[in-house]
Amino acid sequence: DTRYPATLLNGVALRILAEREVSRGRAAILKAYYTKLAESTGHEHPDIPEEVLQVSLNPDATNVPYLLGRLFSVLEAVQAAANPGINATIRDKYFSGASATPAAVFPVLVNLAQKHLKKLNAANRGLSIAYEKQMTELLSKLGTEYPAHLNLPQQGSFQLGYYFQTQARYQKKEEK
């Protein structure tokens, strides 16, 4: 029942930031790290929110880094829907900054998303409304201010929130 070394979390987080991709394997390593840490500390650790220990998207989550990751995924989906076939997405340009310094990046991304929603509304009003509803729900849970910085464990929560929200979107597409 020993913890995984912090270098494991650091290494995975750096790979995610460098490649801007949270793969299934990386998400599994993040979850394993947090699960072991929770077991060794008796779930009484400030950097282990309950959402991180879940096996799928937790729509009732209140953990700010997790919610920010979910919001980033929705913003990425809005951009992709408004600009099909785009070469560089917000993930390519903003993922690292959004997961480390949300206060500097998210106001820009939300502003961009409003423009994307306007464009999408002209092409597909129903999809535009659905994305706007998701954004509004997440933004209301986040409150009025974004955190200036996220530490490494919080970045892991962000990355898992992003991963689970993205996977939930793909599952919905497969069910249709």
Question: Where are each of the predicted segments found?
Answer:
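Intrinsic-disorder/low-complexity detector
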Residues: 1-176
